[in-house]
Curated annotation (Swiss-Prot):
One of its GO terms (cellular component) is centrosome. Mg(2+) binds at E77. This is Tubulin alpha chain. SMART domains: Tubulin, Tubulin_C. It comes from Dictyostelium discoideum. Tubulin is the major constituent of microtubules, a cylinder consisting of laterally associated linear protofilaments composed of alpha- and beta-tubulin heterodimers. Microtubules grow by the addition of GTP-tubulin dimers to the microtubule end, where a stabilizing cap forms. Below the cap, tubulin dimers are in GDP-bound state, owing to GTPase activity of alpha-tubulin. It catalyses: GTP + H2O = GDP + phosphate + H(+). It is found in: Cytoplasm, Cytoskeleton. GTP binds at Q12, E77, S146, G150, T151, T186, N213, N235. It is an enzyme of class 3 (hydrolase).
Length: 457
């Protein structure tokens, strides 16, 4: 019985994160850049054990000589995907899985969703269907995109709608979305694209993992001592998180979690499915020689605000659920002890809503993390990735909503969207939906606080 996953990479952010992910998966599974597995490695029982679950992410070519990623890369203009077509991994992907249009979305959700996107959508849906037909038991989709750009937001939403129509609730849709940074903006209309895109994510995805470049930039700068981190540095760190999250689907382990476990444990209410990620240890090669990495200190590190990959303050919110995905040389007893320590340290401000008293789900995968040769990150024997659903995430939405309101009250830039066939009413509808989302988070927080105060008397 297969448990295959199809990865869909959309727009510049999605495609570049995808590059880093597939580079890392190949390294972890001992796959060459052209998708072949060297003969000497094929004979080794270690490698066979490692590659037992390879079929989750890779399909085998007809002649059995190489493996091909179950992935599709989509962009409305060719430059970013052309880099894959000419890059180190050009022979890894099937040429039909790299799909490009001729003109870009110009940072405009409506171009990605209505005009330019419409021309490409049928080809994309057809390729995805073909990939799905090759699977014995498709588990679901991982979708990667940004919500600030035109392609990531507009075309991403269009594709998610099509997946919802074609596969309904039968297949999980996990979404990795890069949200705009509080300080750094790549385009003036980011707040519009983000609100319109989030409106679609609320309806058409099961879990959305939120990332933001500024938070990840700061982690690279402070923990890896990179003075001016590049997108490659950022994407390699994101790839480690995604690799941790998917390692239990790709390798054997003592306490493996599959996609459904992650979903069931992280999403208490269908709308509140936006999740924060943090990862530890993020440590440079120079420092690694002088540090002792214990399960206790990496567990403690993922609860620290400075290791969270989106800008928000978890100590101001309540946790509804929390998944700890350990990797490497770790036994369940150590993980349990580390979690107990977190619970008992009141000073940490790790507080849960009252209806989720246990709150923690742990997964342990025996496969240690690896780093690419030219990565600044040290290779370590153990790591942990935390996925948390906390009411603090509403801070991200209120920030974007505020920026949206400043422009929309003047109807600034709205004509660019209406000119591409969108109706102005869609802005108001999306904004109302996000206001309702903020209120949903508030009510979860408030009900807990109210009951806590009653207990004090």
């Amino acid at each position: 019985m297969g448990r295959e996953i199809i990865s869909i990479h959309i727009g510049q952010a999605g495609v570049q994160v995808g590059n880093s992910c597939w580079e890392l998966y190949c390294l972890e599974h001992g796959i060459e850049r052209d998708g072949s597995i060297p003969a000497d490695r094929k004979q080794s029982s270690d490698v066979n054990n490692l590659n037992k679950d390879l079929g989750t992410f890779f399909s085998e070519s007809t002649n059995g000589k190489k493996v091909v990623p179950r992935a599709i890369f989509l962009d409305l203009e060719p430059t970013v995907i052309d880099e894959i077509r000419t890059g180190d991994y050009k022979n890894l992907f099937h040429p039909e899985q790299l799909i490009t249009g001729k003109e870009d979305a110009a940072n405009n959700y409506a171009r990605g969703h209505y005009t330019v996107g419409k021309e490409l959508i049928d080809v994309c849906v057809d390729r995805i269907r073909r990939l799905a037909d090759q699977c014995d038991g498709l588990q679901g989709f991982l979708v990667f995109h940004s919500v600030g750009g035109g392609t990531g937001s507009g075309f991403g939403s269009l594709l998610l709608q099509k997946l919802a129509l074609d596969y309904g609730g039968k297949k999980s849709k996990l979404d990795f979305c890069v949200y705009p940074s509080p300080q750094v903006s790549t385009s003036v209309v980011e707040p519009y694209n983000s609100v319109l895109s989030t409106h679609s994510l609320l309806e058409h995805t099961d879990v959305s993992f939120m990332l933001d470049n500024e938070a990840i930039y700061n982690i690279c700068k402070n923990s890896l001592d990179i003075e001016k981190p590049t997108y490659t540095n950022l994407n390699r760190l994101i790839a480690q998180v995604i690799s941790s999250l998917t390692s239990s689907l790709r390798f054997p382990g003592q306490l493996n979690l599959d996609i459904n476990d992650i979903q069931t444990n992280l999403v208490p209410f269908p709308r509140l499915h936006f999740v924060l990620c943090s990862y530890a240890p993020v440590i440079s090669r120079e420092k690694a020689h002088h540090e002792t990495i214990t399960v206790d200190n990496i567990t403690s590190a993922v609860f620290s605000e400075k290791n969270i990959m989106a800008k928000c303050q978890p100590n101001l919110g309540k946790y509804m659920a929390c998944c700890l995905m350990y990797r490497g040389d770790i036994v369940p007893k150590e993980a349990q002890k580390a979690v107990q320590n977190i619970r008992s340290e009141k000073s940490r401000n790790v507080s849960f809503v009252d209806w989720s008293p246990t709150g923690f789900k742990c997964g342990i995968n025996n496969q240690a993390p690896v780093s690419t040769k030219d990565s600044e990150m040290a290779e370590v024997k153990k790591s942990v990735c935390m996925l948390s659903n906390t009411t603090a995430i509403s801070q991200v939405f209120s920030r974007i909503n505020h920026k949206f309101d400043l422009m929309f009250v003047k109807r600034a830039f709205v004509h660019w969207y209406v000119g591409e066939g969108m109706e102005e009413g869609e802005f108001a509808e999306a904004r109302d939906d996000l206001l309702a989302l903020e209120k949903d988070y508030e009510s979860v927080s408030a009900s807990t606080e109210g009951e806590e105060q009653e207990e004090e008397y």
